[in-house]
Amino acid sequence: MSGKQMDVIASIQEYINKILTNIQGMKVLVLDKETAGIVSMVYTQSEILQKEVFLFEKIENTKEKMLHMKGVYFIRPTQENIQSICDELKDPKFNKYHLFFTNTISKVSLDEIAKADEQDVVSEIQEYFGDFFAVNPDTFTLNLPGMLTKKSPRWQGDVGRVVDGLFSSLLALKKKPVIRYSSNSDTTRYLAEKITERMNRDRDLFDFRRQGEPLLLILDRKDDPITPLLHQWTYQAMIHELLTINNNRVSLAKAPGIKDELKEVVLSLDHDIFYKENLYKNFGDLGASIKDLVDQFQDKMNTNQNIQTIDDMKKFIENYPNFQKFSTTVSKHVSLMDELNRLISLDNLMEVSEVQQELACNHDHNSIYNHVLEIVNDSKYTDRDKLVLVLLYSIRYEDGRVWELKEKLSSIGIPPKEIGLIDTLRGYAGASLREGDLLGTKNIFSFARSVVKRGLQGVSNIYTQHKPLLHDILDSILKNKLKETSYPYLSTTQSRERPQDVIIFMVGGITYEEALTVYTFNSLNTGVCRVVLGGTSILNREQFLEDLSSTQISNPSSSSGRR
């Protein structure tokens, strides 16, 4: 195992820290739309202000002249950003310019900047490879939804950004990997080829000390369309599924009676110990964790109310900032759990989820068909949940009674466009198009295995039996048995050894259930194999359905299945 663990949060933090500590004196930090999000996910504003940063600016904003300040730019090397810098250098706003780009900058762009720098105010130009959004230490995203296939409307415009982000992550993690891809996917092969081209073009950047041969495995979301459709029951995944996490921020604006200061909350692993400790806890255990948190807060409240001496008052004042922070943490998580509870109850999600899990884990066809039909016929369930159950059924039983369920959805008033997603999903991720054993017979035993291996109780033993396809892929990597026919190497010279460091990147987006899968794998295999997971986006059900509806795919066999 490499001496230094792969940690995408630490990689970005290291870049930012190096930039701000190496440049002495008061400075203005200038960011673009993307790097503002990248930085905010690993540092708070107050932490950055402590590093002699006087002000934050967006590159697109008109800036006042501050000739006593240094301008420190952390931006993507886009043509738009290069042009903004060149325009500004004609009439400099700062006495010195320190330019840090999140990816490789072309010689043409360097020449443009040099030509524009007539007043000789550019002190340095550097490449610091922080061109991705670090979510968890072992999880990153590029925040690019709508990238399921080459037929997606956004593909042509954003595929270059995907290559940039993945290339940057390799350099940030200091890995020069061999590359494998999903054999049934043009998109993963295309991306593998583009990354290889970049690595060859910039081979000098990959002059790292070698300790084993890392692996970059590029996967396609279509190989597992089930995971993004399922309701989630662990904390981080539930929040994203029901409320949506956007760059560590969650809106509670729709929660009844919510206080103004809680309408948007921040969830940060570095600054919220409760969130960090409960990230992957299941719903059944979260209630106890919240109760413990509230009990701790009440104990502190009682202690603070017992102020009788000057010393007591002094201690209270010294501890007041920590007390305020603790109070905010309690309010935030109680509000989050309250809203999650409300939504689960409102939409009867536990009952829906139980049928979803049965569908995902290969139960008896007649029984599951009847369960799906019962929910479709019952007005207490949402139309969205009814549609998703039929989507899952259509993947699970392609030759089943899909047409009957489509007619049933139509009869209860679900619009034809939404019912059309059933054919779209099968055209995108039908059995003949998928790689890997998504619905293999071993899943029959997943319920028993999950109970025996993890000893889960209560809510989780019913609602978390499903394992993503990624679980089996990681198991194959660990045993050095990942099939070359399914996941070929791009180059002919490949390592036969089990990789110690693995970067898995999924075109079309990842889920927080898969992030949990990677976290669990890493926890069980410390010192043996370490995995980092990245994706074009982090999906929840709504985003996946939106991405699906924007693709121009139809199911060539949409009329089949009727008997």
Swiss-Prot record:
Keywords: Endosome, Golgi apparatus, Membrane, Protein transport, Transport
Protein topology in the membrane: Peripheral membrane protein
UniProt GO BP: Golgi to vacuole transport; intracellular protein transport; vesicle-mediated transport
Name of a matching Pfam family: Sec1
Cellular component per GO, a single term: phagocytic vesicle
Compartment(s) where it occurs, according to its Swiss-Prot or TrEMBL record: Golgi apparatus membrane; Endosome membrane
MF GO annotations: unfolded protein binding
PANTHER family: VESICLE PROTEIN SORTING-ASSOCIATED
Function: May play a role in vesicle-mediated protein trafficking from the Golgi stack through the trans-Golgi network.
Family under the similarity heading: Belongs to the STXBP/unc-18/SEC1 family.
UniProt name for this protein: Vacuolar protein sorting-associated protein 45
Organism: Dictyostelium discoideum
Record gene name: vps45
